[in-house]
Amino acid sequence: MRAVVQRVARGSVTVEGSVRGEVERGLVVLLGVGRGDTDDDAGYLADKVANMRIFEDGQGKMNLSVLDVKGSVLAVSQFTLYGDCRKGRRPGFSGAAPPEEARRLFELFVKELEKYGLKVATGVFREHMTVEIINDGPVTLLLDSKKNF
């Protein structure tokens, strides 16, 4: 399971002209589910996202988590994080999990975040979405539950 985590001042996701999820100060998480990912991968990434200290404290040091700053999370499914661009000019997506399994694990990831007491907004699975991200910093991190990066 892979995630692009961005610290944001604001974020929203719109589907067919309607805002479906939005957050103020917090994180936008673009989440990709890969073939072979399990419940453990969802739990691992939820723990990382909830507890990563990427917000600045009073001294300007990244020392606070989204929990500490009482922020929220906008989680957006994104199978393209498993795009393989090593051959040719069009990415292949064979590394992405099948849609049914990806949906189940995405929803589990959201539930795991909510267990921490976080407010979590989401996009709409398997829909074309317009995602607005107002970065803060900018701070953008890559996470992989298999620890590939």
Swiss-Prot record:
Q: Which domain of life is it from?
A: Bacteria
Listed under catalytic activity are: glycyl-tRNA(Ala) + H2O = tRNA(Ala) + glycine + H(+); a D-aminoacyl-tRNA + H2O = a tRNA + a D-alpha-amino acid + H(+)
Documented EC number(s): 3.1.1.96
Question: Which terms under GO biological process does the entry name?
Answer: D-amino acid catabolic process
Q: Where in the cell is it found?
A: Cytoplasm
Q: Which Gene Ontology cellular component terms are annotated?
A: cytoplasm
What does the UniProt keyword field contain?
Cytoplasm, Hydrolase, RNA-binding, tRNA-binding
Q: Where is this motif: Gly-cisPro motif, important for rejection of L-amino acids?
A: 137-138
Output the CDD domains linked to this UniProt entry.
Dtyr_deacylase (cd00563)
Give the Gene Ontology MF terms in alphabetical order.
D-tyrosyl-tRNA(Tyr) deacylase activity; Gly-tRNA(Ala) deacylase activity; Ser(Gly)-tRNA(Ala) hydrolase activity; tRNA binding
Q: Which Pfam families match?
A: Tyr_Deacylase (PF02580)
Q: What does this protein do?
A: An aminoacyl-tRNA editing enzyme that deacylates mischarged D-aminoacyl-tRNAs. Also deacylates mischarged glycyl-tRNA(Ala), protecting cells against glycine mischarging by AlaRS. Acts via tRNA-based rather than protein-based catalysis; rejects L-amino acids rather than detecting D-amino acids in the active site. By recycling D-aminoacyl-tRNA to D-amino acids and free tRNA molecules, this enzyme counteracts the toxicity associated with the formation of D-aminoacyl-tRNA entities in vivo and helps enforce protein L-homochirality.
Q: What protein family is recorded? A: Belongs to the DTD family.
Self-association and partners: Homodimer.
Record-given protein name? D-aminoacyl-tRNA deacylase
Give the organism, scientific name.
Pelotomaculum thermopropionicum (strain DSM 13744 / JCM 10971 / SI)
This protein's encoding gene: dtd
